[in-house]
A protein has these predicted regions:
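Conserved PLP cofactor-binding pocket of PLP-dependent enzymes
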Residues: 323-347
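Flexible, small-/acidic-enriched active-site or ligand-binding loops
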Residues: 290, 357-386
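Short Gly/Pro-enriched turn/cap motifs at secondary-structure boundaries
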Residues: 64-65, 73, 239-244, 251, ...
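Oxidoreductase and adenylate-handling cofactor-binding alpha/beta cores
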Residues: 187-208, 220, 224-232, 275-282
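Glycine-rich beta-alpha junction loops
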Residues: 40, 140-141, 214-219, 256, ...
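Conserved Rossmann-fold dehydrogenase catalytic segment
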Residues: 142, 171-180, 202-218, 237-244, ...
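Aromatic-enriched alpha-helical interface/lid elements that frame and gate functional surfaces
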Residues: 248-325, 329
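N-terminal helix-loop segment corresponding to the beta1-alpha1 unit
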Residues: 1-203, 383
Length: 386
């Protein structure tokens, strides 16, 4: 048996996270992915000191081959080969088009208009390879009033309203941490769209251009607040860890430094189970907590009382106890916890790969397990030009 995309060649000229990670997902499915980087201006995530190049090996951005040391770059570019070309030079552009002749898919994530300036837009690529599939994923898409805007994940999160939803009621958006959720969703959106285009080409022989707006790919993930606004006129506000409809619904401190467990109770049956798990304290039998409406209307006191109980427990002990009686609960894990987690280890999620410049590490691995199709070998990110 072969991996699903064995025999498919992808050229990746995307920058930062969404596009490169989407191309890596195609590599996870068995495609041969070739990352084309400009020289002498390599990818943002390779440049020491760049805002996008974070998490250096041994916390040293200026070690051997500093352009290979960024954690961001290494995560988003696994399972790829690489080549450096100066696309502003006629020879570099000619070489790129020769490479495109052998490819099935081209991925770019420039701001709208940049591919045209470089001469690698879809019409030019179609002349080179008539059945090529080209995916463009500027932040706001290739058409519309914002088509030329330059964007990064934080700006797209702001445009989508995600910043306004996260955080606590007494904090403004300036206190909201950056998560770049748009980038993660953009990567999966890209991979899905390319798979659909490959299926179409297999049926018809036709390539096509895919216009992906990262913002539009993200907005459905905010479906409830958006639809609540159009259906009920309610403007969403940040609520911390709370929910519009159920309580308790929060994150509670446990024993130990920076130790937490999240708990959700969405029915009277789960509330009864939580009460019994806590030892049925006298306060839990008070009338104000008898029903969902009462619990939802008294969340400040309820959360404080629950936290008095969780403070005496290890976070995983609290999780196992509550899960054992049917109450949704999860210990809040940090990176150290994740790499030591027995469930992820048993499923073989983390994959070990060695890189000549930074050494051998465990990487978050393939997102899928197929019953019939094998997974291709897992490789660390390519070195510059390798």
């Amino acid at each position: 048996m072969k991996p699903p995309l064995e025999g498919i060649t992808v050229i990746d000229v995307a920058e930062v996270w969404a596009g490169p990670m989407g191309a890596s997902l195609l590599g996870d499915l068995g495609a041969t992915v070739i990352k084309v980087e400009s020289f002498p201006r390599p990818a943002h995530t390779r440049r020491p000191g760049s805002a996008m190049a974070k998490g250096y090996t041994n916390n040293d951005p200026w070690g051997p081959r500093p352009w290979d040391r960024s954690a961001t770059h290494n995560m988003a570019n696994r399972n790829k080969y690489g080549v450096t070309l100066n696309l502003d030079h006629p020879t570099g552009l000619k070489t790129f088009k020769r490479l495109a002749e052998m490819a099935d898919v081209l991925v770019e994530a420039f701001s709208a208009g940049t591919a045209e300036k470089l001469g690698i837009h879809y019409e030019a690529m179609k002349e080179t390879k008539p059945d090529i599939i080209m995916a463009s994923m500027p932040g706001w898409g290739a058409q519309g009033p914002y088509q030329g805007y330059v964007s990064l994940g934080s700006g797209l999160d702001g445009f989508s309203g995600h910043y306004a939803l996260r955080g606590y009621p007494d904090n403004d958006p300036s206190m909201t941490p950056v998560v770049n959720h748009c980038d993660a969703i953009g990567a999966v959106t890209l991979a899905f769209a390319v798979l659909v285009a490959i299926h179409h080409r297999n049926r018809t022989g036709e390539g096509q251009w895919i216009d992906i707006s990262q913002v539009e790919g993200f907005l459905p993930h905010l479906g409830r607040p958006m639809m609540d606004y159009v259906m009920n006129g309610r403007k969403p506000v940040p609520m911390g860890n709370r929910d519009h409809h159920v309580a308790p619904h929060g994150c509670y401190r446990c024993r130990g430094e920076d130790s937490w467990v999240v708990i959700t109770v969405s029915s009277d049956q789960e509330w009864e189970a939580l009460r019994q798990a806590m030892g049925d304290p006298e306060w839990s039998r008070e009338a104000e907590f008898d029903c969902l409406l009462g619990r939802h209307g008294n969340q400040d006191r309820l959360d404080a009382l629950i936290q008095e109980w969780t403070r005496g427990l290890d976070k995983k002990e609290a999780m196992r106890l509550l899960q054992g009686v049917g109450v949704p609960a999860q210990a809040v894990l940090n990176d150290e916890d994740l790499y030591a987690d027995p469930h992820l280890e048993a499923r073989g999620f983390f994959q070990r790969a060695g890189h000549p410049s930074i050494g051998e590490y465990l990487y978050p691995g393939h997102l899928w397990k197929f019953g019939k199709s094998p997974r291709p070998p897992f490789r660390a990110a390519n070195g510059l030009g390798e």
